[in-house]
Amino acid sequence: MSCFAEAMRLDLRRNALWMALAALLIFLLAPLVGMSAQMTARQTARAVEAASALAGVAALCGLFFPERERGVREAVAAQGVPLWTVWAARAVWLLVALWVSSCAAALLLEAQGSEISRRMALAGFANAAFTGGLAALCAAFSGSLALAAALPSLWFAVDLCGLIPPRLTLFTDAFGLPGNKLPLFLAGLLLLALAVFVKTRRPWRA
């Protein structure tokens, strides 16, 4: 646990803050647009679910990229922190940032009197965890930021057309489907854990 805390301390200031800020801004964009455009509940749900999916990609697609990789190398060399804890600490910190961002968006919806505000906090976080986990896994395997962003974007586009199975759709509330997003959230956590596992065992780029 002390190694994990040290890894988070080393990594937090220089690597994760801008990604978390980008996610927060994207999350808050949907309620603000809904407020200005006088959207219906279903239209607002679609906007929030779309924004949260994009926020997950923004926060996690750059998880393993070169400038952050150099920071990991320095932390491991200087402090003797195990490699996997640095990647895991970064992923956990960004998941926490996504949860806070999702709750902030839900509070903004509630302030507008929206009937879907509480549901959107969990739905938005599940979307962000899934698309972010998918982006991180693509990044770990490919080493390409473009591919890491492209595959979740493709999933997003196909899903928006209604072609994804209901248990894995990003747009449960927008499509008026029953059930919750627990399977989507768990799939996102699994993808993110697999991404950290893969990255830990791949050699650093020179």
Annotate the PLM regions.
Residues 16, 81-110:
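Selective transmembrane-helix segments that form parts of the transport pathway or gating/packing helices
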Residues 30-39, 105-114, 162-172:
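Juxtamembrane "helix-exit" motif on the non-cytosolic side of transmembrane helices
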Residues 53-58, 89, 115-120:
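Short alpha-helical transmembrane interface motifs in multi-pass membrane proteins
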Residues 62-93:
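Helix-loop-helix units of permease transmembrane domains in multi-pass membrane transporters
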Residues 85, 146-147:
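Residue-level recognition of membrane-helix boundary sites in multi-pass small-molecule transporters
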Residues 104-130:
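Membrane-interfacial helix-loop-helix connectors in multipass membrane proteins
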